[in-house]
Amino acid sequence: MLKVLYVIFTIFGYIWPIYSVMFHLTPNTQKCLKEDIQANQLVMGEYEVSDVPGQIIDYIARDTKGHILSQKEHITKGKFSFMSEVYDAYEICFISKVPPHQRGISQEVSLVTKKGVETKSYEGIGEASKLKPLEVDLKRLEDLSDSIVRDFALMRKREEEMRDTNEKTNSRVLFFSIFSMCCLLGLATWQVLYLRRYFKAKKLIE
């Protein structure tokens, strides 16, 4: 049983969204990392910035409407967390600031983020509920399974919405094409009749 759980947790470890990234931020620039997050989901992160005297890096987390969820100035090393209110694309930006008189150099930024189930402390839950290690593992596996089911349900819903949008767009394009053809035929008919009357008036045709 323990071996089976180990294999399952290993698989989940490869597919579950724990993101770790490291990059270099050039002076007086900003770099943003964007991700789609479900509604009412906790997001936690840890960051660390290489120290360069005289240079400052700020970070800010916000949604697509510009609402600030978390921010801090002059960061070096720390943690942050915020709760998503609605399904949206959220972004975390790191902003470099270097005084005009100083020649800036790139700074290394590392970021690790967790969301949803991975933000829970199952060790604390086990101690509070007096659960055995195996029961804690089963609880974690149950939460992971439920979260994956919700993710797939959301993906299916978005796929259906996109399909409906495509079908509506195709219907509108077809209607517009038919309408355009009718307008062109009407214009061509009017031109023929107008030219016929014009030539008759000029007695060029009978």
Curated annotation (Swiss-Prot):
It is found in: Membrane. Residues 194-206 are cytoplasmic. Coiled coil: none annotated. Residues 30-140 form the GOLD domain. Pfam families: EMP24_GP25L. InterPro entries: Emp24-like, GOLD_dom. It is a single-pass type I membrane protein. GO terms for biological process: dorsal/ventral pattern formation; endoplasmic reticulum to Golgi vesicle-mediated transport. Keywords: Developmental protein, Membrane, Signal, Transmembrane, Transmembrane helix. Residues 1-20 form the signal peptide. One of its GO terms (cellular component) is membrane. Belongs to the EMP24/GP25L family. Eca and bai are essential, though not redundant, for dorsoventral patterning of the embryo. Specifically required during early embryogenesis for the activity of maternal tkv, while the zygotic tkv is not affected. This is Transmembrane emp24 domain-containing protein bai. The gene is bai.
